[in-house]
């Protein structure tokens, strides 16, 4: 086989592997069907904007920063053990505070379900590659930190199966979802961060019959 033909064949194989490995982020979100009493904690940027469109609900709390999502979600799961807490995180955010994985491994919460959408890029700042585009394996790091059953899925069929099982069974889950870098604009946020947080607080206060903020919040 000539070098040119070999080169074309390798390119075709690479394309097939890439298509099989990755799928659209927005498409993936539609497969996460959470219960009416569940708490959703969602990373910032496109993750929040897409989720607000796919699943608008008072029980969503949206982040305004990076790196602190796992600690906050773990805290929510600990103080609300009777409710399922679903964290939608990203590779860039998890990489910013890897030490959170050791805490997660040491103090697991059976009602916490974590999905890390890994597009191997910092999309919000221009698509610069994260270290997961090279050799870093977030699920492997989580396993080494004591997070049992942490795994990576790379196609829609595997994701649908993993998401369905995670949301239907007891026990903490940690699923890294390989998705393609999104193209085009994301849906515009319907609420400001302050409005969304206020709505979430009112929702928890009403459903838990507890006061969280003693001052008036709007």
Task: Mark where each language-model region is.
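N-terminal low-complexity segments that are often proline-rich with Ser/Thr-Pro
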Residues: 1-16
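Thiamine diphosphate
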Residues: 49-118
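Conserved thiamine diphosphate
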Residues: 129-164
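Glycine-rich beta-alpha junction loops
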Residues: 44-47, 119-121, 178-183
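Glycine/aspartate-rich loop-and-adjacent alpha/beta segment that forms the canonical ThDP
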Residues: 22, 54-56, 169-218
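Active-site diphosphate/adenylate-binding microenvironment
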Residues: 17-65
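Generic beta-sheet signal
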Residues: 38-42, 83-87, 112, 171-177
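Long, charge-dense
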Residues: 117-128
